[in-house]
Regions:
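A short loop-to-beta-strand structural motif that recurs across blades of beta-propeller domains
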Residues: 68-72, 106, 115-119, 161-165, ...
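Residue position within the beta-strands of beta-propeller blades
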Residues: 58-60, 106-108, 151-153, 196-200, ...
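Bacterial Sec-dependent N-terminal signal peptides
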Residues: 11-36
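Short loop/turn segments that connect beta-strands within beta-propeller blades
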Residues: 74-79, 120-125, 167-171, 215-220, ...
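Short loop/turn segments immediately following the C-termini of beta-strands
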Residues: 62-63, 109-112, 155-157, 201-203, ...
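A short beta-strand motif characteristic of beta-propeller blades
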Residues: 32-40, 79-87, 126-132, 172-179, ...
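Bacterial N-terminal signal peptides that target proteins for export
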Residues: 1-9
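Beta-rich, blade/repeat-based domains predominating
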Residues: 41-54, 88-101, 133-147, 160, ...
Length: 306
């Protein structure tokens, strides 16, 4: 079992404290172990998502012929990944999330001039365009608390970074928040209260570059939760299944991989060393289990944390 190290206290916005207690008795504690699940047959994975029960992982990567591909793999160690969808319209899949019923995968794809939000059946089959308009180069994607809308980070047509809401059926994207302090937002999680937790590589916070922001459902502000986060590419963030704790793949000051967790109520930050990982990137918790799917982009490996 890897050691968790208390590293800091951060200032959680007062309006958010107490709003994220455990849901339905689900686990809210940060992960304490990281275990290798799968490698081989794919390269450069970007993001992963767990099935609601945590037994199956889905991830975006490139296959051995360098085609962008969506894969499925058991969350058990030593598993072999199976391709679900490959090639067009997938170009540069960066963000991945699953519908609440586990039937559909939604993809934020930054490829081409404008990028696109795509959808694909989790059981396998071709990806298709969702038909979302008004968002350019989506990077992070998350399911909304009502399961009827998606949230995505991306750009306005003039290049302004923004957070968007998009119906799961497609259509016009609604701007939730735009502009500073957002700079290059990617990783995204939206909790049961509609608060968006956004990872931003280049944004500046009190402790340095690399910021976790909290944006309330009304889009009134983007508050710094933690900064000086040496996140992977793309940055990932997910709350525990029961809420209460935000978990992010990062690196320490020496460049060593770790999972950084922030207790939303207290601001306590802990780090879980992940010495086998090289470039921790995307991460997502199971909806109904204390399991996280984690990708190592550089090493081409999928891990589970719990």
């Amino acid at each position: 079992m890897a050691k968790r190290l208390l590293v800091a206290l951060v200032s959680t916005p007062a309006a958010l404290i107490g709003c994220h207690s455990s849901d339905d008795g689900l686990p809210s504690d940060p992960p304490t172990t990281v275990t290798k699940v799968s490698s081989g047959g794919f390269q450069s994975p970007t993001d992963a998502v767990a099935s609601p029960d945590g037994k199956t992982f889905y991830f975006a990567a490139w296959d051995d012929t360098k085609q962008p591909t969506l894969f499925q793999v058991s969350s058990q160690p030593g598993s072999t990944a199976t391709p679900l969808a490959a090639g067009d319209p997938l170009e540069a899949p960066i963000g991945l999330v699953m519908s609440c019923d586990g039937a559909t995968l939604y993809v934020a794809d930054m490829g081409g001039e404008a990028g696109a939000i795509l959808q694909a059946p989790a059981a396998g089959g071709a990806a298709t365009a969702l038909g979302a308009t008004g968002i350019v180069r989506p990077g992070g994607i998350a399911m909304g608390p009502d399961c009827k809308s998606l949230f995505a980070t991306g750009l306005l047509s003039d290049g302004t970074p923004a957070l968007f809401e998009v119906p799961v059926a497609g259509g016009a994207a609604r701007v939730v928040y735009q502009g500073a302090p957002l700079t290059s937002p990617t990783g995204l999680h939206v909790d049961s209260q509609g608060v968006a937790w956004v990872m931003d590589h280049h944004a500046q916070g009190p402790e340095g570059a690399g910021v976790l922001f909290a944006i309330p459902a009304d889009g009134s502000t983007a508050d710094v939760v933690a900064s000086n986060l040496r996140m992977g590419t793309p940055g990932g963030v997910s709350l525990t299944a029961g809420g209460g704790t935000a978990v992010m793949p990062t690196r320490d000051s020496d460049g060593n991989a770790q999972l950084t967790s922030v207790d939303i109520a207290t601001g306590t930050v802990t780090n879980l060393a992940a010495p086998d990982m090289t470039d921790p990137a995307g991460l997502r918790s199971a909806r109904k289990a204390g399991v996280f799917a984690v990708v190592d982009s550089e090493a081409g490996t999928i891990y589970r944390a719990e």
